[in-house]
């Protein structure tokens, strides 16, 4: 992944997360649980009780299913490198972009995205204990990312609320945003 996709895209600070606070990478946040959260059994059946965001799941084996750690800026750069827009050169073929972004029937995910409707934002959501994320790539090329370092108990409502916030912010401030390639090397 690093050799063929991330590094050619200019993304050098993506890493597979560790399972415990001691495994935290430089530049990685600390994850938090809600005050009502209770300790849970460690993923490896050790009998130890752990904080859910540090030891409930074996993150290192999740790989593409949520183990990656990256900043919002790095995620935007990756999206710009796989979106089929030639402002930032793509690191995947036009055929791969087309495959990943073809609109799917209701309740079916696109390849790598949750949804890729025509003339609306492409959507990718994700959550694990201790984090939630939302990535929107708009038809005008803007990419908006929101990442938390705590779990939300709102379920899918978290993404809906965040998308509504993004729309309000785009309407209010969109004309004030710079209209330029933010990833010029």
Question: Each predicted region: which residue ranges?
Answer:
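Short, gly/Ser/Thr-rich active-site loops of penicillin-recognizing serine hydrolases
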Residues: 153-185
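Short Gly/Pro-enriched loop/turn and capping motifs at secondary-structure junctions
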Residues: 118-120, 128-130, 151-153
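Short, surface-exposed loop or secondary-structure junction motifs
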Residues: 1-121
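Extracellular/periplasmic catalytic domains that process cell-envelope and extracellular macromolecules
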Residues: 104-107, 127-129, 136-140
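Short, well-ordered beta-strand elements
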Residues: 132-137, 142-154
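Gly/Ser/Thr-rich beta-alpha loop segments that engage phosphate groups in nucleotides
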Residues: 66-68, 128, 132
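Hydrophobic residues embedded in beta-strands of well-ordered beta-sheets
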Residues: 120-122, 142-143
